UniProtKB/Swiss-Prot annotation:
It catalyses: L-aspartate 4-semialdehyde + pyruvate = (2S,4S)-4-hydroxy-2,3,4,5-tetrahydrodipicolinate + H2O + H(+). CDD domains: DHDPS. GO terms for cellular component: cytosol. It comes from Synechococcus sp. (strain CC9311). This is 4-hydroxy-tetrahydrodipicolinate synthase. Belongs to the DapA family. The record marks 54, 117 as: Part of a proton relay during catalysis. Pfam families: DHDPS. Pyruvate binds at residues 55, 214. It comes from the Bacteria.
Length: 302
């Protein structure tokens, strides 16, 4: 009989929300609403919040807006909740500066995306992440692999080379591959906590050794995701599977077009006026919005 696998730690909890950035009618960041939404997400089961990542529209936020968002959310939720700042860039120098600023502004960690557009080789990726890790050694890092957006994938073997950086503690796997979890665990060992970057792959990734999820759907179904995770961890696999199947249509709807367009509409439909995304993203079209409204209504009845 094979020995039992060693489970990974959970440096940021199990359910993290990749938080939207609210805008007012003039397109300005609504920091007051951001604080209220952050507290609501925690009340609904999130143990951590990721501020100014992909869902937070980081490409269209200034660095000043991002720093203030971090400070507002940090103050809103208090010290008992993990707050991660999106500090990635395709410029290593810019990412280093942003990560240092996040550490100084009270972040519990940084989500650092693979550099986009310039398509560095694996050796360049290793050097990039090592420079960031060394620049803020006190700040735990979550490496973020999302090749569908960046055009480059961080190989498990490259991640393994970074395991001698003590603050490289976690990995957001958003390549769409369940096998990536196993490959990361085999290459890096259990010290690297792998988080699913896709709500729809959370349950199968948990079975492969992931510790949790950086979620979009938790904006509107946080308690149900928490219930699914807890059921799986307690051995109630049928209960977890039932939740997964009930939530799958919502997972699909939230990515029927570019994130965060649908989730912002879902929040609006749920009473949170977070505003439209900034250009070049657009509000959800009326047909998709109507379909999403029907899904949310049906879920409230189950």
């Amino acid at each position: 009989m094979s020995p039992a696998a060693e489970l990974s730690p959970t440096p940021f909890g199990r359910l993290l929300t990749a938080m939207v950035t609210p805008f007012d009618a003039e397109g300005r960041v609504d920091f007051a609403l951001a604080g209220r939404l952050a507290r609501h997400l925690v009340e609904e089961g999130s143990e951590g919040l990721v501020v100014c990542g992909t869902t937070g529209e980081s490409p269209t936020l200034s660095w000043q807006e991002q720093v203030k968002m971090l400070e507002v959310v940090r103050q809103a939720v208090g010290p008992g909740v993990k707050v991660l700042a999106g500090t990635g860039s395709n410029s290593t120098g810019e990412a280093v500066k942003a990560t240092r600023e996040a550490a100084a502004s009270g972040a519990d960690g940084a989500l650092v995306v693979v550099p986009y557009y310039n398509k560095p080789p694996q050796e360049g990726l290793e050097a990039h992440f090592r420079a960031i890790a060394n620049a803020a050694p006190e700040l735990p890092l979550m490496l973020y692999n999302v090749p569908g957006r960046t055009g480059t994938s961080l190989a498990p073997a490259t991640a393994a080379q970074l395991m001698n950086c003590a603050n490289v503690v976690s990995f957001k796997a958003a390549s769409g591959s369940i096998e990536e979890v196993t490959e990361l665990r085999l290459a890096c060992g259990p010290r690297l906590a792998v988080y699913s970057g896709d709500d729809g792959l959370l349950l199968p990734m948990l079975s492969a050794g992931a510790v949790g999820v950086v979620s979009v759907a938790s904006h509107v179904v946080g308690r149900r995701l928490r219930h699914m995770i807890d059921a799986y961890l307690s051995g109630q696999n049928a209960v977890a599977l039932g939740q997964h199947e009930q939530l799958t249509p919502l997972f699909q709807a939230l990515f029927a077009t570019s994130n965060p367009i649908p989730v912002k509409a879902a929040l609006e439909l749920s009473g949170w006026p977070v505003g439209a995304p900034r250009l070049p993203l657009l509000p959800l079209n009326s047909a998709m919005r109507d379909s999403l409204a029907d899904l949310l209504t049906a879920l409230r009845q189950t």
